[in-house]
């Protein structure tokens, strides 16, 4: 057995040496030959002899590693006992720097890469930090103070930096979580104990001289200018900050992961031997930091961030140091030291008297242990006092039993507290029960919040208060928070920032805001006489960075992201910071309200106005988004499932919000909140039930200015609404939040009187002010209220409030109990449905009101018709009833039959003789059932069925289905019989086996399918409507009915044949469109341009191409133009001037200017049609001559000045559109004339009201052209130009050139 054991040791040793072979230096050659017999001697190695014995839970590799670290530490150096100096100085080894670097390599390669603590434990066992590193640094600092020249100063500095690096690595914070490796879980407690030993010796050795030596290392770096610093200098400065951070962060491990315990977390006492909490407490840290200039170093560094030091490099370490200093410290302990000193003096007197009697030494009250003991003794005395109140009976010294007997059972209660009163007897009976319900609290929200507070003695309070005052008055807080806020705001997503770093930032901001607020409140009470000149002022300027816009954005983003990710630890931190912001705002308002009630007048009105704006700005910035307010309301609903500290913060936030909203409502302050919703662009809607061609043409006219909305179907818009404080307050009184308050109050023994009053204030607001009685008719609440009353002392003011509330509560509950003798509902939380609320409160049934909003409406069904008009009424009803049965709408047919039966019966029974003689009936309105109401809107078959019967079908949900009085009873009876008959004969078959749907089709006209957003409602107060959509009598698109005959008029003037139409003679048919397959493919831009060119202009103005492009850029100018009031008068004058010129030209040229001329034109045209004229141009010329529109001679042209030149023609030609899409087709000589004009580079438009937008100057050309020759007369009125031509038969083309 021994032989096999030695072989296993040898094999494990070989494996360990292979694993650590890179770091082992051996002079021996490796022997790879195997032993030939079992008795061969094992290689005698010094390291192997040191690792022959293993400790529990230790491997051979770990033992070998420990031996190598021990060798390196020994080679580093040690005390020089040959020196006559006592104590002997430390003497470095010859290769001290190499040893330090080797140890660093071991830590990096083993501990960090493999996730182990083996090297750290080996260094702790060898005493590297305590016996070597600290001694080396302190001895070097003493030599620097003596100002004696040092040998090898450069090498010594390198050794000091290596010592600092090892100190930082060995004191680096270690955390235990579920992701830790097995090695880390196993050795976590040992590593933490070793770090506690390091912290004790760092603070105690030579009164913390190690810290002074470390700061001395970085002094040359600080003295350099920022530009002159090298990366190495910044690395040294960063190492010093990390070392200070590590010293502050080292604390005893208070928890470890356990897989066997139900709680999964086991509390342990992890203080090593010979170390007590006073050695590493905050009192010792602050005293050591003060004596060794560490606090001054932090002030210098944090105040110079961004200017002398890089904020990205040093900002976060500085913030962590400040956070760890103030962590767990209550601001009241710093601001009220007198109260603490009185308690300490009282406690010292009591302990002194007790020690004289017992002759036992006591712990000093100035130590941390003494302060902690004082707190525990005060809690014990309070509990003893409560216990003596309950057991002070006449039989207090005797044991007794109390028997409670029922019909079949009996209970026996023992104990003196059961004899006090009935409540105590029942409580004792409840204590005897076995409870199996487990705690529902999840302590998953306190990782960054320290539950236990720090106990500071008098000297530590003075040191910390002085540091805080200097930190605020010197602007260090603002500089530090601005730098960290800049770093956080520069990150695209806060999720990529470490949670601990974010927690440090927000907790630091919250602590200093709390300190500043409490300090201002204290000086308001005591006055400013105790305020020194160097102290911080009473305004909030020293913490302005915490109230900046950047910080509000960060806190809201951090709040929202933590809630969405269900990161309760981060959410707890966010709520603490959020609470402090609310408290600052509320404290300012409460201070001003108190001054107003007392009638005090403030001399500094400017400062008061600034504070008011600050308070309002805080609330406005925090509650500027509706979704954030929703999150704030949702958080308290589940707060009872988490830790008591988390629950307490949630209750405080709700309390402050309600108080702030109340103050805002009293001050009549308006708060606007942004809400986000999704707005769907409404599809293009048809104007009237017109044919498709007219509908498409008019749609371009109406919605031509809405091109910018066509690219975006769904658009998210933001709008601001005024926050209704009363409505928002109601949301904080949901049943789930009430349950949270009840759960919070159930811990009344752990609550202060202020916290109990906070709960009572909430219940008073709910029950008394809002009179929501049923919300508190709960058995658990009544039971807690009764226990709370018994717990509070009789002389307490809180008990008086509880008594008053109980009296009012029972008075209302008695009335409710009389109405409901069996109140089963009090056993459960109330339902939030209005039916239950109204019934429990009043006993009445709740009638749910019909919603009158857009979303409750439905689309209007398409209009359908029969494929033939010769169907009889009976056949039509047969088809519709069959379709409804196919769609499984039998209930709808049954409802129609029932309603028709009622109407006919009432008419036959209620008609008097006078009504029979007069043959008059009353109109009937039908209000369908809820399940049928929507079908009357969106089902076309039932709508057609009711229409056939004679009903007027509704178009919106609120509109009834009305039967006019002119519908005869006989017709109703006939329809009723037919519907009954075909309903009973279902299923019905048709000829040729066709389906009933075959005989129906959709009407042409209004396209309801595109109108999918129409709901029949219009709310004039709806904020989503930008402007009124009614016709504007002054607008440019008012007379849309004038556009109805555009296509007809165009076809008539083009002279196309109407042989394929059924229109009467003299009426132009609608122009045929080319099939889509024959049309060339064009881009959307060209298609859009073509539609615009074919579009009738606004108010029939002739617009040039340049102006068209200009108007395309200006969208909806009629409604959104910024200078409408200034430019309307000029536009009107310009418009009337153009119209006057056009009218004058028409009169001079013989145009149609009155209805008489138009009638004559129609008569002449009809005669030409009857004479079978083939040439349209000839017909037009004859019609013009017969109606004397244009004379052969031109007397009006003779009066035009001769200064006119031909330049106007060339000028107008450049602006004329010669597109083939817009040119009309001419037959015969008309076509020849067009070609002739094109050859002359002159464009002639057709005589049609569909005037193309083909000019851009403010001139009008009248081109008189002979159809037989190319001679022409050009009359230009703008520049007075005349071009003479052959005065024969001519046709007139009018074009409007204007910009």
Swiss-Prot record:
InterPro entries: Timeless, Timeless_N
Main subcellular location: nucleus
GO BP, one annotated term: DNA repair
Acidic residues bias spans: 15-28
Low complexity composition bias: residue spans: 338-360
PANTHER family: PROTEIN TIMELESS HOMOLOG (PTHR22940:SF4), TIMEOUT/TIMELESS-2 (PTHR22940)
UniProt name for this protein: Topoisomerase 1-associated factor 1
């Amino acid at each position: 057995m021994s032989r096999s054991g030695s072989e296993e040791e040898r094999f494990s040793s070989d494996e360990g040496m292979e694993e650590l072979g890179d770091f082992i230096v051996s002079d021996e050659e490796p022997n790879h030959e195997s032993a030939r017999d079992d008795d061969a001697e094992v290689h005698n190695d010094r390291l192997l002899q040191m690792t022959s014995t293993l400790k529990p839970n230790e491997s051979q590799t770990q033992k070998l590693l420990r031996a190598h670290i021990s060798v390196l530490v020994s080679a580093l150096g040690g005390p020089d006992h040959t020196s006559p100096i006592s104590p002997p100085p430390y003497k470095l080894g010859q290769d001290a720097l190499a040893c330090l670097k080797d140890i660093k390599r071991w830590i990096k390669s083993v501990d960090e890469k493999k996730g182990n603590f083996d090297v750290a434990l080996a260094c702790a066992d060898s005493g590297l930090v305590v016996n070597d590193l600290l001694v080396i640094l302190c001895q070097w600092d003493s030599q620097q103070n003596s100002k004696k020249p040092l040998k090898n100063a450069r090498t010594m500095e390198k050794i000091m930096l290596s010592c600092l690096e090892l100190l930082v690595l060995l004191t680096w914070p270690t955390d235990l979580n579920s992701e830790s490796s097995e090695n880390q879980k196993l050795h976590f407690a040992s590593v933490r104990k070793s770090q506690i030993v390091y912290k004790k010796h760092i603070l105690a050795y030579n009164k913390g001289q190690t810290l002074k030596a470390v700061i001395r290392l970085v002094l040359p770096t600080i003295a350099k200018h920022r530009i002159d610093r090298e990366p190495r200098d910044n690395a040294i400065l960063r190492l010093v900050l990390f070392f200070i951070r590590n010293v502050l962060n080292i604390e005893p491990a208070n928890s470890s992961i356990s897989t066997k315990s139900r709680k999964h977390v086991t509390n342990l006492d992890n203080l090593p031997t010979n170390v007590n909490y006073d050695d590493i407490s905050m009192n010792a840290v602050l005293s050591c930091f003060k004596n060794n200039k560490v606090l001054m170093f932090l002030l210098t560094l944090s105040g110079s961030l961004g200017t002398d030091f890089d904020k990205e490099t040093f900002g976060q370490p500085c913030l962590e140091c400040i956070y760890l200093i103030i962590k767990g410290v209550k601001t009241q302990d710093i601001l009220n030291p007198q109260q603490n000193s009185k308690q300490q003096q009282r406690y010292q007197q009591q302990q002194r008297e007790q020690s004289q009697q017992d002759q036992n030494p006591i712990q000093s009250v100035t130590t941390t242990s003494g302060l902690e003991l004082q707190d525990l003794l005060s809690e014990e005395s309070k509990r003893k006092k409560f216990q003596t109140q309950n057991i002070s009976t006449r039989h207090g010294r005797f044991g007794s039993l109390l028997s409670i007997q029922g019909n079949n059972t009996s209970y026996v209660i023992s104990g003196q507290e059961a004899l006090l009163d009935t409540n105590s007897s029942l409580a004792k009976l409840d204590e005897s029960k076995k409870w199996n319900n487990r705690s529902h609290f999840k302590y998953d929200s306190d990782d960054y919040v320290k539950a236990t507070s720090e106990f500071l003695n008098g000297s530590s309070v003075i040191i910390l208060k002085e540091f805080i005052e200097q930190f605020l008055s010197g602007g260090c807080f603002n500089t530090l928070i601005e730098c960290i806020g800049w770093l956080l705001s520069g990150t695209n997503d806060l999720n990529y920032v470490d949670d601990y770093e974010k927690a440090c930032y927000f907790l630091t901001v919250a602590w200093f805001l709390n300190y500043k607020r409490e300090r201002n409140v204290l000086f308001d009470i005591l006055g400013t006489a105790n305020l020194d000149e160097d102290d911080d002022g009473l305004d909030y300027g020293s913490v302005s960075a915490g109230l900046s816009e950047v910080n509000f954005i960060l806190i809201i983003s951090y709040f929202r992201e933590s809630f969405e990710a269900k990161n309760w630890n981060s959410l707890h931190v966010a709520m603490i910071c959020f609470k402090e912001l609310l408290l600052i705002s509320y404290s300012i308002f409460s201070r001003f309200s108190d001054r107003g009630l007392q009638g005090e007048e403030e001399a500094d009105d400017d400062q008061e106005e600034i504070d008011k704006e600050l308070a309002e700005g805080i609330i406005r910035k925090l509650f500027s988004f509706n979704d954030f307010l929703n999150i704030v309301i949702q958080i308290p609903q589940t707060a009872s499932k988490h830790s008591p500290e988390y629950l307490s913060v949630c209750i405080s936030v709700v309390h402050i919000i309600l108080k702030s909203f109340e103050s805002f409502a009293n001050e009549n302050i308006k708060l606007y909140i942004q809400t986000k919703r999704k707005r769907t662009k409404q599809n293009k809607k048809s104007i009237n039930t017109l044919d498709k061609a007219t509908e498409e043409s008019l749609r371009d006219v109406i919605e031509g200015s809405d091109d910018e909305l066509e690219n975006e179907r769904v658009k998210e818009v933001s709008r601001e609404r005024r926050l209704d404080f009363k409505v928002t307050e109601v949301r904080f009184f949901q049943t789930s939040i009430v349950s949270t308050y009840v759960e919070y109050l159930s811990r009344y023994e752990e609550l202060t009187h202020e916290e109990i009053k906070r709960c009572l204030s909430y219940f008073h607001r709910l029950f008394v002010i809002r009179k929501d009685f049923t919300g508190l008719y709960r058995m658990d609440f009544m039971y807690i209220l009764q226990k709370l009353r018994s717990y509070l002392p009789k002389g307490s003011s809180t008990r008086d409030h509880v008594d008053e509330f109980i009296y009012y509560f029972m008075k209302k509950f008695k009335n409710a109990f009389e109405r409901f003798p069996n109140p089963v509902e009090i056993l459960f939380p109330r339902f939030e449905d209005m039916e239950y609320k109204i019934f429990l409160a009043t006993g009445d049934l709740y009638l749910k009101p019909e919603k009158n909003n857009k979303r409750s409406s439905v689309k209007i069904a398409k209009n359908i018709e029969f494929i033939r008009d010769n169907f009889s009424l009976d056949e039509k009803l047969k088809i519709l009833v069959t379709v409804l049965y196919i769609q499984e709408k039998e209930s709808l047919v049954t409802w129609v039959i029932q309603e028709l039966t009622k109407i006919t019966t009432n008419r036959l029974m209620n008609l008097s003789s006078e009504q029979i003689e007069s043959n008059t009936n009353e109109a009937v309105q039908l209000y369908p059932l809820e399940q049928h109401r929507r079908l009357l809107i969106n089902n076309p078959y039932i709508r057609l069925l009711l229409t056939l019967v004679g009903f007027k079908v509704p178009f919106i949900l609120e509109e009834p289905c009305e039967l006019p009085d002119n519908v005869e009873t006989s017709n109703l009876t006939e329809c009723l019989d037919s519907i009954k008959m075909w309903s009973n004969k279902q299923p019905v078959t048709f000829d040729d086996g066709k389906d009933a749907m075959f005989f129906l089709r959709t009407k042409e006209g209004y396209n309801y399918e595109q109108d999918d957003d129409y709901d029949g409602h219009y709310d004039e107060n709806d904020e989503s409507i930008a402007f009124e959509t009614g016709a504007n009598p002054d607008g440019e698109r008012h007379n849309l009915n004038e556009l109805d005959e555009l296509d007809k008029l165009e076809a008539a003037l083009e002279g196309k044949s109407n042989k394929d139409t059924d229109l009467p003679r003299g009426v132009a048919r609608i122009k045929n469109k080319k099939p889509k397959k024959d049309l060339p493919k064009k881009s959307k831009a060209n298609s859009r341009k073509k539609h615009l060119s074919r579009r009738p202009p606004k108010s029939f103005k002739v617009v040039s191409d340049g102006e068209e492009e200009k108007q395309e850029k200006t969208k909806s100018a009629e409604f959104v133009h910024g200078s409408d009031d200034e430019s309307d008068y000029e536009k009107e004058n310009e418009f009337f001037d153009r119209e006057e010129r056009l009218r004058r030209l028409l009169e001079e040229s013989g145009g149609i200017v009155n209805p008489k001329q138009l009638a004559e034109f129609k008569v002449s045209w009809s005669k030409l049609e009857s004479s079978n004229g083939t040439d349209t141009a000839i017909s037009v010329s004859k019609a013009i001559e017969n109606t004397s529109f244009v004379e052969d001679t031109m007397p009006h042209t003779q009066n035009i000045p001769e200064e006119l030149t031909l330049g106007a023609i060339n000028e107008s030609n450049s602006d004329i559109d010669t597109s083939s899409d817009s040119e009309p087709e001419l037959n015969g000589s008309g076509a020849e004339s067009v070609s002739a004009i094109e050859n002359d580079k002159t464009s002639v438009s057709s005589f049609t009201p569909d005037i193309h937008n083909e000019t851009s100057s403010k001139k009008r050309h009248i081109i008189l052209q002979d159809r037989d020759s190319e001679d022409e007369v050009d009359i230009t009125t703008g520049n007075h130009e005349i071009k003479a031509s052959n005065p024969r038969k001519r046709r007139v083309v009018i074009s409007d050139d204007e910009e």
